[in-house]
């Protein structure tokens, strides 16, 4: 991948037209998603919107042109790698500022580094923001369960 410091280990299946619907068919049935451009350090990455849910991992910035893709969401699953700034990922403060700007109904923080303790985060995050955990499941427009 041009500009990346990491060798590619996956088969290259390019999505050349961001913001245009793509369809994927798999074991769970057909799925329609809208890819949108994100910044991931010196390279671009793609986020995906599926209905009123968006997924943004590997993101260090969201270009203005992509903001409409994450407006009016029920759930935004979004990168929050660690507490301190990182060159290729959102850090907690930046993630929370973006959540405040984009205003999803709820947000789930993902790609959390080991120093992002679940119990600590649960006690300090805004009421509509949840740290993800292994095995977490959610359903659009239904309550998000906290890990017990």
Where are these regions (language model features)?
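Short, hydrophobic beta-strand segments that form beta-sheet elements in well-ordered domains
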Residues: 54-57, 108-110
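A general structural motif
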Residues: 36-40, 57-64, 87-90
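Binuclear metal-dependent hydrolase catalytic cores
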Residues: 1-56, 122-148
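Binuclear metal-ion centers of metallo-dependent hydrolases, dominated by the metallo-beta-lactamase
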Residues: 63-75, 80-148
């Amino acid at each position: 991948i041009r500009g990346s410091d990491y060798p590619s280990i996956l088969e290259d299946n390019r999505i050349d037209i961001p913001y245009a619907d793509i369809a994927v068919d798999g074991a769970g049935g057909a799925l329609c998603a809208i890819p949108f451009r994100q910044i991931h350090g010196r390279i671009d990455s793609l986020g995906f919107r599926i209905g009123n849910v968006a997924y943004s991992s590997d993101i260090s910035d969201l270009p203005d042109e992509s903001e409409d893709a994450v407006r009016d969401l029920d759930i935004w699953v979004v990168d929050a790698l660690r507490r301190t700034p990182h060159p290729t990922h959102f850090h907690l403060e930046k993630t929370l500022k973006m959540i405040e700007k984009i205003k999803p109904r709820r947000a789930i923080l993902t790609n959390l580094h080991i120093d992002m303790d679940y119990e600590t985060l649960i006690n300090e995050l805004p009421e509509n923001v949840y740290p993800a955990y292994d095995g977490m499941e959610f359903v659009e427009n239904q309550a998000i369960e906290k890990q017990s």
